[in-house]
Amino acid sequence: NYYTPDYETKGTDILAAFRMTPQPGVPPEEAGAAVAAESSTGTWTTVWTDGLTSLDRYKGRCYDIEPVAGEEHQFIAYVAYPLDLFEEGSVTNLFTSIVGNVFGFKALRALRLGDLRIPPSYSKTFMGPPHGIQVERDKLNKYGRPFLGCTIKPKLGLSAKNYGRAVYECLRGGLDFTKDDENVNSQPFMRWRDRFLFVAEALFKAQSETGEVKGHYLNATAGTCEEMFKRAIFARELGAPIVMHDYLTGGFTANTSLAYYCRDNGLLLHIHRAMHAVIDRQKNHGMHFRVLAKALRMSGGDHFHSGTVVGKLEGERDITLGFVDLLRDDYIDKDRSRGIYFTQDWVSMPGVLPVASGGIHVWHMPALTEIFGDDSVLQFGGGTLGHPWGNAPGAVANRVALVACV
């Protein structure tokens, strides 16, 4: 009774679109019902305590199934979940239910969560991004163009002093931001406190010489939440405008906690998506990146890596622009051509700046500005530091190319 094709969805339901591949001989209706049951109130048998609650009120319902065009034995199962199944303001609880045990089901060869519709009645229980796009522009006093960034390379092995030197040269050359690589936490060759101190010196020197507000994404990701907060607090005490977090490896609970701290203390929050391809790259199993993007917007982040379309990392143009819109816009219409299964209304939740990063350089600038528009961060690592004349000329080249394109 978890397959209910007559069910009319409510405005408060959380809706999910699963791409499922049933085992041979398993009807799609049975597989869809199993997904709805296991991700809500069901278990492998009937239990007597079912009679002590109203399963009809709390159960998930598979309300529609459609075949995947061009694929044999693959189906899109649409499941509606009542709002009361989920703790308010908790991405952790949302994912524990919807993508928990169900992905290991024997009745399924593969299962992928393609999209989620988050109703305003649930999204309003989340703080969302600490500040959002407009507040960030006001803090930095920069308008009418994308922001320019650079990931410091080599990503591992530099001393703190040489790292700070590279930061200074890039910011002095015209970039708005430099960035810790996601791998950089606090290793023997460069402890986090030393890095923070040399970077702060570089930051303020570049600011005083250029008259522009500059930033460096100081990676606060750590092995414990306590250590993460220690690093974020030290960054704030130094006067840094922005910190960074690896939200998948760090975890949603840690990320949401850090986002609250950043809003309360005036820090911007840059989010890296390290580990995402483990979850989202297979087209038949796992979770699509657009779901991870929606989850991040709720959990909290001001910048988020979204792919480039033109760089070294995988990403189709229309699909990428679909989740860029889901990060930035208030209201996004259903559009299956871009992989958007449901209309999404974020109401007043602040937007997130998409970050284009990965194998891009100045020759990509016309395409990047056309694809991403003004509200974005264009981040060049090797595309800055690989300039034959050095780091500062690489930064100058990026800034000149950007000005020419906008």
From Swiss-Prot:
NCBIfam families: PRK04208.1 (NF003252)
Keyword line: Calvin cycle, Carbon dioxide fixation, Chloroplast, Disulfide bond, Lyase, Magnesium, Metal-binding, Monooxygenase, Oxidoreductase, Photorespiration, Photosynthesis, Plastid
SUPFAM superfamilies: RuBisCo, C-terminal domain (SSF51649), RuBisCO, large subunit, small (N-terminal) domain (SSF54966)
Gene name as annotated: rbcL
Cofactor: Mg(2+)
UniProt subunit comment: Heterohexadecamer of 8 large chains and 8 small chains; disulfide-linked. The disulfide link is formed within the large subunit homodimers.
A GO term for molecular function: ribulose-bisphosphate carboxylase activity
GO BP: photorespiration; reductive pentose-phosphate cycle
Name of this protein: Ribulose bisphosphate carboxylase large chain
Active site: 153 (proton acceptor), 272 (proton acceptor)
Note: The basic functional RuBisCO is composed of a large chain homodimer in a 'head-to-tail' conformation. In form I RuBisCO this homodimer is arranged in a barrel-like tetramer with the small subunits forming a tetrameric 'cap' on each end of the 'barrel'.
Cofactor binding note from Swiss-Prot or TrEMBL: Binds 1 Mg(2+) ion per subunit.
Taxonomic source organism: Trichomanes striatum (Fern)
Sequence positions that bind Mg(2+): 179, 181-182
Modified residues (N6-carboxylysine): 179
Binding site for substrate: 101, 151, 155, 273, 305, 357
Site entry (Transition state stabilizer), positions: 312
Enzyme Commission numbers on file: 4.1.1.39
A Pfam family hit: RuBisCO_large
